[in-house]
């Protein structure tokens, strides 16, 4: 029995890793923006993989507001809640409260049911680039426990037509690309202190492409462009995820059309 268990895990896991080593879109971070983007991109028929460094979904959703089990979403993001069948309750002035556990579960289920592949426990270490001028064409990754151990282990590769940084406050993928491929012309400014109503609007406005093949969504947008943080209101994260999906899909379709022409 033990042999069969081991062989089943090894053979099926390696098959998945092989299948998703070449994708249309690689998303780094299974938080609200990353999971939202994954669902809307996968629904369009794109091959999508999501890498999450932890062994759980949700990013900053789970702790709620200072560990209180509620988060807030504004009126503009309610259509996305409805898409994912997430229940919400009115608060005041166009704000609604949502249960963090329900939001995590339904965002993840929505992405998976749409066809996205989520792989947990993955630390993205670097990007792949090609060309002059350069374009980001994929990722290098290792398992998170290896990265945490401090051991030097060479990573493996994932090729992608588009890479989305949804890693949160540190904008880890964009930061490493800015540092190691200066020809991309990326500058990571660092996020500012809180100004929620301004940040919720600006994070959506600035969501999109930062360099050829590389996109940013969610709170990582604040880090890249020097925007204020917003705290435990997540409508901007959801809307940012949906917007980056729309931008990536439009760009990939335009590139495919140009190749055919």
Swiss-Prot record:
The entry's glycine-binding residues are: 229
Q: Does the keyword S-adenosyl-L-methionine apply?
A: no
What's the protein name? Answer: Thiamine thiazole synthase
User: What's the superkingdom here?
Assistant: Archaea
The reaction(s) catalysed by this protein are: hydrogen sulfide + glycine + NAD(+) = ADP-5-ethyl-4-methylthiazole-2-carboxylate + nicotinamide + 3 H2O + H(+)
Query: Which SUPFAM superfamilies does UniProt cross-reference here?
Result: FAD/NAD(P)-binding domain
Q: Which family does it belong to?
A: Belongs to the THI4 family.
| Function field | Involved in the biosynthesis of the thiazole moiety of thiamine. Catalyzes the conversion of NAD and glycine to adenosine diphosphate 5-(2-hydroxyethyl)-4-methylthiazole-2-carboxylate (ADT), an adenylated thiazole intermediate, using free sulfide as a source of sulfur.
List cystine links. Answer: none
Summarize subunit and interaction data from the UniProt record for this chain.
Homooctamer; tetramer of dimers.
Q: Which organism is it from?
A: Pyrobaculum aerophilum (strain ATCC 51768 / DSM 7523 / JCM 9630 / CIP 104966 / NBRC 100827 / IM2)
User: So what EC number does this one have?
Assistant: 2.4.2.59
């Amino acid at each position: 029995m033990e042999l069969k268990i081991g062989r089943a895990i090894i053979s099926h896991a390696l098959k998945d890793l092989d299948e998703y080593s070449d994708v249309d879109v690689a998303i780094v971070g299974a938080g609200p923006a990353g999971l939202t983007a994954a669902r809307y991109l996968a629904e369009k028929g794109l091959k999508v993989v999501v890498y999450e460094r932890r062994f759980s979904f949700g990013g900053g959703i789970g702790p709620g507001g200072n560990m209180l089990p509620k988060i807030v979403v504004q009126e503009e993001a309610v259509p996305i809640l409805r898409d994912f069948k997430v229940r919400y309750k009115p608060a005041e002035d166009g704000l609604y409260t949502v249960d963090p556990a329900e939001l995590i579960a339904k965002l993840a289920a929505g992405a998976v049911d749409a066809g996205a592949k989520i792989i947990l426990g993955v630390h993205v270490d670097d990007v792949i680039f090609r060309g002059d001028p350069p374009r980001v064409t994929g990722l290098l990754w290792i398992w998170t426990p290896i990265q945490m151990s401090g051991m030097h282990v060479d990573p493996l590769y994932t090729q992608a037509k588009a890479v989305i940084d949804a890693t949160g406050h540190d904008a880890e993928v964009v930061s490493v690309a800015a540092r190691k491929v200066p020809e991309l012309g990326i500058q990571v400014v660092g996020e500012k202190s809180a100004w929620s109503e301004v940040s919720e609007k600006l994070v959506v406005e600035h969501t999109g492409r930062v360099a050829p093949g590389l996109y940013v969504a969610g709170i990582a947008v604040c880090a890249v462009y020097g925007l204020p943080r917003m705290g435990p209101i997540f409508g901007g994260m959801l809307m940012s995820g949906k917007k980056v999906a729309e931008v990536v899909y439009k760009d990939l379709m335009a590139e495919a059309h140009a190749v055919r022409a």
